[in-house]
């Protein structure tokens, strides 16, 4: 039986991970749970899975959590705040930690888990995108495994099994095209938050669904693939695949192409990250290619989706620039979800902030450098947007 801790247990990744644990109680045991704000769901999860340690990031909810767990017939460790999340990440005899915390907030807990010798089921791509220069050396130093738990990188990881070290020519990341893949670019200026949250294929959290709509999600995955698989950026390509059946492909030196296929269901890559190198039998719906009928592909439209080029540029710049890109995107998406900016303002703000960053040529940033760049970029998005809002108010008065 494998013992696991789940960071971000009340989010999309966390709840699907716990669905797997509930389905396979003889395979997995939950040692730790950590969440951000959803105290009611976290409490229910603790009652069901009986972890040894639990933490909620929002300290305002800590006493409520303690009260809701007072009826338990055992006494788990109950913590609060960011340090509480870090404690869960490195706690006890968990063999694997699922990192499902959204955004760069997952970086410090992931580092704590690595230093504690835990294998990482990586569902938080931002950790590697922002912290790759720090995280990868720690992975090597502590001898832990970094197993991708998102569909695209899991697909690549699976396709690479048995491929010789120099056998890989390039990676092809598939993208659904997001909520607006069939919408003309001239109509994007009027789309709403609710429009953007209607993903045609996947059930995901709000932030990643917006990233899918801008295709920044795919741009971030390019940077993640660079760190995970060691390829230069000109050997990582994006292709639009509306059906989301092929989760990604690799091209080998002899021009052979290998692909991993399956229904768009996040449980599959999560299960593989938890069970690797084993394959566990499931009773989930099997892929019926006759039912699917056809698989189609398109060239991505860089005019419609400028976030892809921004991501490639940040990745090639290296240093702390990917952290700036990631933080600017997180902050811009948050503003969009709050309906403070329009959909097309997301890439505009990101580009503005990346252009203002002046220390991107630092080849080997420290953790402090990355955290500083992250905080600077978030503040810069707010400042840039305030200038835009002020300008809009002046225009409206005139």
Swiss-Prot record:
InterPro entries, sorted: DXP_reductoisomerase (IPR003821), DXP_reductoisomerase_C (IPR013644), DXP_reductoisomerase_N (IPR013512), DXPR_C (IPR026877), DXPR_C_sf (IPR036169), NAD(P)-bd_dom_sf (IPR036291)
EC number: 1.1.1.267
Residues reported to bind 1-deoxy-D-xylulose 5-phosphate: 125, 151-152, 176, 199, 212, 217-218, 221
Keyword field: Isoprene biosynthesis, Manganese, Metal-binding, NADP, Oxidoreductase
Reactions catalysed, as given in the entry: 2-C-methyl-D-erythritol 4-phosphate + NADP(+) = 1-deoxy-D-xylulose 5-phosphate + NADPH + H(+)
Keyword Oxidoreductase on entry: yes
Disulfide feature: none
Keyword Oxidoreductase in annotation: yes
Enzyme class: oxidoreductase
Protein name: 1-deoxy-D-xylulose 5-phosphate reductoisomerase
Species annotation: Gloeothece citriformis (strain PCC 7424)
């Amino acid at each position: 039986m494998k013992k696991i801790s789940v960071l971000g247990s009340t989010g999309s990744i966390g709840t699907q991970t716990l669905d797997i644990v509930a389905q396979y109680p003889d395979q997995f045991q939950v040692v730790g749970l950590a969440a951000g704000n959803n105290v009611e769901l976290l409490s229910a999860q603790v009652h069901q899975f009986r972890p040894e340690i639990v933490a909620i990031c929002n300290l305002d909810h800590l006493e409520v959590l303690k009260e809701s767990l007072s009826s338990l017939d055992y006494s788990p460790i109950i913590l609060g705040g960011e340090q509480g999340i870090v404690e869960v990440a490195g706690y006890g005899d968990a063999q694997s930690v699922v990192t499902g915390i959204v955004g760069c907030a997952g970086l410090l807990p992931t580092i704590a888990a690595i230093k504690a010798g835990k294998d990482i089921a990586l569902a938080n791509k931002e950790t590697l995108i922002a912290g790759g220069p720090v995280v990868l050396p720690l992975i090597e130093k502590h001898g832990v495994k970094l197993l991708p738990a998102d569909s695209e990188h899991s697909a690549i990881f699976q396709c690479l099994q048995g491929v010789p070290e120099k056998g890989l020519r390039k990676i092809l990341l598939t993208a659904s095209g997001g909520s607006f893949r069939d919408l003309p670019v001239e109509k994007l200026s009027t789309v709403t938050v609710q429009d953007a949250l209607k993903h045609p294929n996947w059930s995901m959290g709000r932030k990643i669904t917006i990233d899918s709509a801008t295709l920044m999600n795919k741009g971030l995955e390019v940077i993640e693939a660079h760190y995970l698989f060691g390829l230069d950026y000109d050997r990582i390509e994006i292709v639009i695949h509306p059906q989301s059946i092929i989760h990604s492909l690799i091209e080998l030196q002899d021009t052979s192409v290998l692909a991993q296929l399956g229904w768009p269901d996040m449980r599959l890559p999560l299960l593989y990250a938890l069970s690797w190198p084993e394959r566990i039998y499931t009773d989930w719906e099997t892929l019926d290619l006759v039912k699917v009928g056809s698989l189609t592909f398109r060239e991505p439209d860089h005019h419609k989706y400028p976030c892809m080029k921004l991501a490639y540029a940040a990745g090639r710049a290296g240093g702390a620039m990917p952290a700036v890109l990631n933080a600017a995107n997180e902050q811009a998406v948050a503003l969009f979800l709050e309906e403070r900016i329009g959909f097309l303002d997301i890439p505009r703000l990101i580009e503005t902030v990346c252009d203002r960053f002046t220390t991107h040529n630092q080849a080997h940033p420290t953790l402090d450098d990355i955290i500083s760049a992250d905080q600077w970029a978030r503040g810069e998005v707010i400042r840039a947007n305030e200038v835009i809002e002020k300008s809009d108010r002046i225009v409206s008065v005139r």
